[in-house]
Amino acid sequence: MSDVVQDELSKKQTTRLNKLQKRLRREVGSAIADYNMIEEGDRVMCCLSGGKDSYAMLDILINLQQRAPVSFEIVAVNLDQKQPGFPEHVLPAYLETLGVPFHILEKDTYSIVKDKIPEGKTTCSLCSRLRRGTLYGFAQRIGATKIALGHHRDDIIETLFLNMFYGGKMKAMPPKLLSDDGANVVIRPLAYCREKDIAEYAELKQFPIIPCNLCGSQENLKRAAVKDMLKQWDRQHPGRIETIFTAMQNTAPSQGVDREQFDFVSLKQDPNAEFRGDVAEADLPAFDFMDTANSGHINLDDASKRQGTRIDVVSTFTP
């Protein structure tokens, strides 16, 4: 933290900042360890957009670099896509204060997007694809072994629901990804971090935020709707978002319906199998007692103490 920022923050704000930094550092460290994101000798290319997420990612990675059990390099990279009004001086000035190696690339993808996308339509998808292609190529040029992007936990969950609602796929953003050509490994160190923590951290750190709407494009309405839905859930049902993310880490293909993930076709009964594992329904005395009190629950272990009526088998039929 710079002395300027320290001087401008109150004691309460400084305490809060330190607490947030500790939490984000712990979450980023856990994500890196869980997915083996950064290894000994890695050159990590941190893609910096000028938004709160990428600023926070770079800040935390620099902090972790000083105490990490492995040695790795950090190179910050920003792509100036020639959007009108883009403040070219902001990022270089900020990065110089950090003393971290950086590159500012220039490529006029803005004109390409405006030429291809009809007026009034969202340009974000094409813009991001063009940006990704440029960054992938530059990563190979500078010998980067990892490309770090600033997507956080909320981005990952939003993408899951977007693909479910509009794409018919159970697909999100993986914390670690190998590019289609196998030439680049993409990592998302903020995968365990909440957006609201990042936003508060960025505000307290006073990062020089560059707005992402310089192109004039409106936010993707579908993503905005999903974001609002998740925010409402978070307010009304605290802990639900955490549970969703935990569920994404604990999938059970054999309990789903995706034939590509599990071979249901080949499932056969083993005539020699011995009973083991969970008790089958046939072995439970589910109909030995009737709930005459209509309480909705029968305690089979204590059935003798309850008001119950024995159900007898009075007849059988064999075709």
From Swiss-Prot:
Record's keyword annotation contains Transmembrane helix: no
Localisation per UniProt entry: Cytoplasm
Quaternary structure and interacting proteins, as annotated: Homodimer.
Cofactor note: Binds 1 [4Fe-4S] cluster per subunit. The cluster is chelated by three Cys residues, the fourth Fe has a free coordination site that may bind a sulfur atom transferred from the persulfide of IscS.
Cofactor: Mg(2+); [4Fe-4S] cluster
Note: The thiolation reaction likely consists of two steps: a first activation step by ATP to form an adenylated intermediate of the target base of tRNA, and a second nucleophilic substitution step of the sulfur (S) atom supplied by the hydrosulfide attached to the Fe-S cluster.
Motif PP-loop motif, residue range(s) on this chain: 49-54
Organism per entry: Shewanella amazonensis (strain ATCC BAA-1098 / SB2B)
GO CC annotations, alphabetized: cytoplasm
Task performed by this protein: Catalyzes the ATP-dependent 2-thiolation of cytidine in position 32 of tRNA, to form 2-thiocytidine (s(2)C32). The sulfur atoms are provided by the cysteine/cysteine desulfurase (IscS) system.
PANTHER family: AMINOTRAN_5 DOMAIN-CONTAINING PROTEIN, SULFURTRANSFERASE-RELATED
Reaction(s) catalysed by this chain's protein: cytidine(32) in tRNA + S-sulfanyl-L-cysteinyl-[cysteine desulfurase] + AH2 + ATP = 2-thiocytidine(32) in tRNA + L-cysteinyl-[cysteine desulfurase] + A + AMP + diphosphate + H(+)
Protein family membership: Belongs to the TtcA family.
Entries under Gene3D superfamilies matching the protein: HUPs
GO MF annotation terms: 4 iron, 4 sulfur cluster binding; ATP binding; magnesium ion binding; sulfurtransferase activity; tRNA binding
UniProt protein name: tRNA-cytidine(32) 2-sulfurtransferase
Pathway per the UniProt entry: tRNA modification
Keywords assigned by UniProt, alphabetized: 4Fe-4S, ATP-binding, Cytoplasm, Iron, Iron-sulfur, Magnesium, Metal-binding, Nucleotide-binding, RNA-binding, Transferase, tRNA processing, tRNA-binding
Example GO biological process: tRNA thio-modification
Annotated binding of [4Fe-4S] cluster, by residue: 124, 127, 215
EC nos: 2.8.1.-
First-level EC class: transferase
